[in-house]
């Protein structure tokens, strides 16, 4: 991962880093637009808190897909700007 991507990914997580459960596996990939975590068969993408700093503007901050669907262009199972909704979704 390039230093730029590492710095950007760090900024994406800055405000919620302490809230990310320890059992989530960081599977971030430099070619993705934002960092991602794997938990319970779900891939959780976490974009920048500030929308105009996101590579893809006009989208919600958090996206969840089934891990098996990665790279297939499927519609997310959940799109939200609220981290509490992400936690609830992946734990059900």
Each predicted region: which residue ranges?
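Negatively charged, low-complexity tracts enriched in Asp/Glu with abundant Ser/Thr
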Residues: 1-42
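Short intrinsically disordered terminal tails
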Residues: 1-3, 88-92
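Structural alpha-beta junctions
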Residues: 19-22, 71, 91-92
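Intrinsically disordered, low-complexity regulatory segments enriched in Ser/Thr/Pro
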Residues: 42-85
């Amino acid at each position: 991962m390039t230093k730029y991507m590492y710095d950007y990914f760090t900024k994406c997580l800055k405000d919620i880093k302490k809230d990310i459960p320890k059992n989530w596996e960081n599977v971030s990939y430099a070619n993705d637009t934002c960092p991602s975590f794997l938990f319970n068969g779900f891939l959780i993408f976490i974009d920048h808190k500030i929308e105009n700093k996101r590579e893809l503007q006009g989208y919600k901050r958090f996206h969840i897909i089934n891990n098996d669907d990665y790279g297939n262009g499927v519609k997310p199972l959940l799109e939200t700007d609220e981290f509490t909704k992400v936690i609830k979704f992946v734990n059900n």
